[in-house]
């Protein structure tokens, strides 16, 4: 699977097209564009999408921003589809402030990815 970088950011941002699903059920929501963020520990999904899935609640957590600020958040479990792959039971944080999906290392470390900056494409090597 190949996806072109999003040029709405400068410099262009690596992104992937994903689907979301209730754990162990079909990937029913999507496709959505998700930011590939290799510096993020975890994956963040807008709370509205999590509520539409009625995703199972896992725990209340605290997150630290890149500026060192702490925020309270809620963690849920969802399945995430990338290309023909289904990544089951991924713990994600529900974001009440943004409509962006951020794929962190808890997802990215399960994929074989090529970030081809000169060509401005993200490739999932299956």
List where the protein language model places each region:
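Pepsin/retropepsin-fold aspartyl endopeptidases
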Residues: 1-126
């Amino acid at each position: 699977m190949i996806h072109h970088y999003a040029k709405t950011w400068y410099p262009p941002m690596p992104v992937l097209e994903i689907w979301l699903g209730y754990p162990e059920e079909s990937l029913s929501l999507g496709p959505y564009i998700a930011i590939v963020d290799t510096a993020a520990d975890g994956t963040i999904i807008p709370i509205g999408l999590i509520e539409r899935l009625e995703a199972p609640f896992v725990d209340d957590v605290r997150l630290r921003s890149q500026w060192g600020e702490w925020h309270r958040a809620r963690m849920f479990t969802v399945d995430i589809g990338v290309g023909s792959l289904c990544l089951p039971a991924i713990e994600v944080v529900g974001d009440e402030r943004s409509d962006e999906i951020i794929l962190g290392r808890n997802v990215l470390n399960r994929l074989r990815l090529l970030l081809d900056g000169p060509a401005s494409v993200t490739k999932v090597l299956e």
